[in-house]
């Protein structure tokens, strides 16, 4: 098995952010259910960059927790590159606090969620959302974290 993570910290302050080993662990927990070889870039950004990218690519003028940009190889070329995840530090921290979740659990959830998007999963239709939520919960719980959707299910 070969997984590769290119981690980019593009934040003013990196204090308190999870280690590269943690990001690698979370990525591998999600991707290895589907394929043994994979490459990903995870870029940790501040609000300004998240908001600019969310506006440009989704038409939403606000920061968001995670954006996924799948890599589309030209025909005839096979690469293990899944794509890029852009995760906004401040949004993740605010959401974890609002949802009363441990911060590392929410970081792990964002990596798993984004990786599933890169693997082709989505949550636009109800049926797809249920499948994606099931996978996220299964992966997160295997890592020892609580169900990320527990509060919504109560």
Curated annotation (Swiss-Prot):
The keyword Transmembrane does not apply. GO terms for molecular function: metalloendopeptidase activity; RNA endonuclease activity; zinc ion binding. Its main location: cytoplasm. It is an enzyme of class 3 (hydrolase). Disulfide bonds: none annotated. Signal peptide: none annotated. Binds 1 zinc ion. Its EC number is 3.1.-.-. HAMAP family: Endoribonucl_YbeY. PANTHER family: ENDORIBONUCLEASE YBEY, CHLOROPLASTIC. This is Endoribonuclease YbeY. It comes from Photobacterium profundum (strain SS9). The gene is ybeY.
